[in-house]
Amino acid sequence: MTKGILGKKVGMTQIFTEAGEFIPVTVIEATPNVVLQVKTVETDGYEAVQVGFDDKREVLSNKPAKGHVAKANTAPKRFIREFKNIEGLEVGSEITVDIFEAGDVVDVTGTSKGKGFQGVIKRHGQSRGPMAHGSRYHRRPGSMGPVAPNRVFKNKHLAGRMGGNRVTIQNLEIVQVIPEKNVILIKGNVPGAKKSLITIKSAVKAAK
């Protein structure tokens, strides 16, 4: 069965194991998620559990949103997402960080940091041209393709907006769970800026 929770990225730090091993970790704060709706094949055409995370003021919600969360007897939520393959939850129940434990392998999804308009070297890792005197080719995108089609093919590496994409990093290890602080420590870094939404789910490709 899949396990999942929504949280916010706090930042990075490091911890030491009892053996003295240095481990860089990302701190994720995941306050209790509230189950807002349990979707079934009969009513919705598929099975999923809809959860809400991070309370917001009622004045920022419209009437349909207020009525939706009222069924779960909770406050309006800033983020609403769905998890599949989760069983045994009812509307109004809470999902807390203690569903995970140290050693669990998870997939972490976030929105990568926006870098603005960037060139092909930074955006695609393209090699630069000669920097010596006399060269007129330094950081340009290079050939646009053959003459015959009279157009540029799709997916040609060009300059443009970089970052701000949905990114999933698979098979990250949970180093520690601190239930009293609603905190999960994940080994390594995860996508996104501080305070950004992070989705943590059981790894789909974890070694069994």
From Swiss-Prot:
Keyword NAD found: no
SUPFAM superfamilies named in the record: Translation proteins
GO cellular component: cytosolic large ribosomal subunit
Cited Pfam families: Ribosomal_L3
Ranges where the record places region Disordered: 123-146
Keywords: Ribonucleoprotein, Ribosomal protein, RNA-binding, rRNA-binding
InterPro entries associated with the record: Ribosomal_uL3, Ribosomal_uL3_bac/org-type, Ribosomal_uL3_CS, Transl_B-barrel_sf
UniProt-recorded Gene Ontology molecular function terms: rRNA binding; structural constituent of ribosome
Biological process, per Gene Ontology: translation
Family: Belongs to the universal ribosomal protein uL3 family.
Functional description taken from the UniProt entry: One of the primary rRNA binding proteins, it binds directly near the 3'-end of the 23S rRNA, where it nucleates assembly of the 50S subunit.
PANTHER family: 50S RIBOSOMAL PROTEIN L3, LARGE RIBOSOMAL SUBUNIT PROTEIN UL3C
The protein's assembly and partners: Part of the 50S ribosomal subunit. Forms a cluster with proteins L14 and L19.
Name the record gives this protein: Large ribosomal subunit protein uL3
Organism: Streptococcus thermophilus (strain ATCC BAA-250 / LMG 18311)
